Amino acid sequence: MVTSTVKLEEVRRMQRAEGMAAVLAIGTATPANCVYQTDYPDYYFRVTNSEHLTNLKERFQRMCESSQIRKRYTHLTEEILQENPSMCVFTAPSLDARQDMVVAEVPKLGKAAAEEAIKEWGQPMSRITHLVFCTTNGVDMPGADYQVAKMLGLPTSVKRLMMYQQGCFAGGTVLRVAKDLAENNRGARVLVVCSEIMAMAFRGPSESHLDSLVGHALFGDGAAAVIVGSDPDEAADERPLFQIVSASQTILPGTEDAIVGHLREVGLTFHLPKDVPEFISDSVEGALTDAFMPLGVHDWNSIFWVVHPGGPAILDQVEEKVALHKARMRASRNVLSEYGNMASATVLFVLDEMRKLSADDGHATTGEGMDWGVLFGFGPGLTVETIVLHSVPITAAAPLIMQ
């Protein structure tokens, strides 16, 4: 029997990274088809043959006007909807058509975002060791993770994790998972992709399901990708954008029916009650205290905010609950205005917007000149993801990080 002289503790030490996980690059993508919110009520009621529902259309018009959204992007063009009329009826069986569409398009949009992130990262794809792919729709085998790995030409040894049907909180989830992977696997480079196409949920209006109309006033399509890794290789010009300091998830008791989605023959149905913003805003103070108490941070206006903009009421009530200055939510409100709610991808768009606004405004760090920041994801459960971030200096030596 041969006795090894290597101790398990030493093996474990060699397996782990030395430093904290960081976001090294961010990329985003949207479908080409852009819809403006001012035009959408007329368009939506026309393509769904619902113009006779004048009172309902007026209500939808008011929803769109109060959404704080200027425009959104969607894979569904009028031509596609004309070819799939069952998708325009509230209760018509249409799952096969929706599934075929989403299974094909989600990886394509994810690939586009991933290519942008990889371009900014500036390293060969052979260095990607892990792939985390997240989408709300299009469950299939092999999954979207496999398809995008194949499209990108990632190494066949890449370690994949596929996350389906998590919903809007999952933009935080993927960062939490990527942090664990990067810090526990020396040299790991994790490609994270969130790709969301809401074709599963599009349908005509119903006078008895007004919360479905709320979703139609908010949701858009988009994909975001990030590269996460520890111990940036400065010799290869790897540069962090944000360090991922800590990550936690919590379920809000008694809220399991607050945001509900069900996959049916008619597609994905969802329930969005009016008290969701109140549930979320009531939870934020406790989440902040738990996350920042160990760091000695107590002033919530002294940190930068990267918040999933599920809708204007969520941002408004969170802002009011913790007495935030209006400027703290600017990145989230900008993304809501220009893209709508893109489920899991949205908060990564906000992270991208944060570093760009910080550079455009001449701040010293990627977090509006502040050191500490928080990223929040909210979604079904109700589930709250809380990520503590640390910004990095913006310097002339790192021009690529702001492109």
Curated annotation (Swiss-Prot):
CoA binds at residues 59-66, 313. The keyword Cell membrane does not apply. GO terms for biological process: flavonoid biosynthetic process; polyketide biosynthetic process. It catalyses: (E)-4-coumaroyl-CoA + 3 malonyl-CoA + 3 H(+) = 2',4,4',6'-tetrahydroxychalcone + 3 CO2 + 4 CoA. Substrate binds at residues 220-221. It is an enzyme of class 2 (transferase). CDD domains: CHS_like (cd00831). GO terms for molecular function: acyltransferase activity, transferring groups other than amino-acyl groups; naringenin-chalcone synthase activity. Keywords: Acyltransferase, Flavonoid biosynthesis, Transferase. SUPFAM superfamilies: Thiolase-like. Pathway: Secondary metabolite biosynthesis; flavonoid biosynthesis. PROSITE patterns: CHALCONE_SYNTH. The keyword Transferase applies. Its EC number is 2.3.1.74. The active site is at 168 (acyl-thioester intermediate). Homodimer. Belongs to the thiolase-like superfamily. Chalcone/stilbene synthases family. The primary product of this enzyme is 4,2',4',6'-tetrahydroxychalcone (also termed naringenin-chalcone or chalcone) which can under specific conditions spontaneously isomerize into naringenin. This is Chalcone synthase 2. It comes from Oryza sativa subsp. japonica. The gene is CHS2.
